[in-house]
Amino acid sequence: MGTLYIIPTPVGNMEDMTFRAIRILKEVDLILAEDTRTSGILLRHFDIDNRLMSHHKFNEHETSASVVKRLLGGENIALISDAGTPGISDPGFFLVREAVKAGVDVYTLPGATAFVPALVTSGLPCDRFAFEGFLPQKKGRQTKMIQLADERRTMIFYESPRRLVKTLQQMAEIFGADRQACVCREISKVHEDCRRGTLSSLALHFTQEEPRGEIVLIVGGADADTVMSRQADDNTPEDGETTKPRRKSKYQLKQERLEETD
């Protein structure tokens, strides 16, 4: 029986590639790549001449069965994404799950991912955090934010430059304008930059200065006083009501109003 290797690749600087990753990519029987053209540049840089097969979110359900069959037949196979660690906001989970079900050994190498450097650099608490990845693009986007409004842990999001300002503005309204955050762009690349501030100040900054590049957004968690105050406000009866909580809280009504504009 073969082995499936999950290989992180640099998110920017080629020097972030590990010796072990290079060795395994040279030794395996097959490399699965999210985009063979993009990965081809990386592989040529490290003189890795090996068979490549496309494996991405549009075909992973179809190709995983054949890949598992090859693994069961004794082939050693490596999976890489365009950048970072497969399975983290990239294809990988489905294949790993199917390989595990089939009893195949799976080894994931430690290595590059964009959110860990961004989290540590942000200056926000990183002892406990919630990785949220990409928010829904359309319907449900603000609803998801509302669900996270009372999250006490530091939150990590991936975002596109064209949606960043709107996201910051929505978060300022839902989480609070003074919530601390950090926008990290182009991690491990030439123009790497991290800007810290409140959600409202960051929204203003990027309204005036167009954001570019790949973005990791780090948002501080809600403090205990804010959570308790919001919960108390939601359960405060209106004039003429009994002490029983309202059927729908102010917070719930706000959620419904925002859902209509998602």
Where would I find each of the regions flagged by the language model?
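Class I SAM-dependent methyltransferase SAM-binding "motif I" and its flanking Rossmann-like core
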Residues: F94-E151
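A contiguous loop/helix-start segment that scaffolds small-molecule binding in enzyme catalytic cores
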Residues: T154, Y158-D262
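Loop/turn-to-beta-strand initiation segments
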Residues: T3-L4, G74-A78, T154
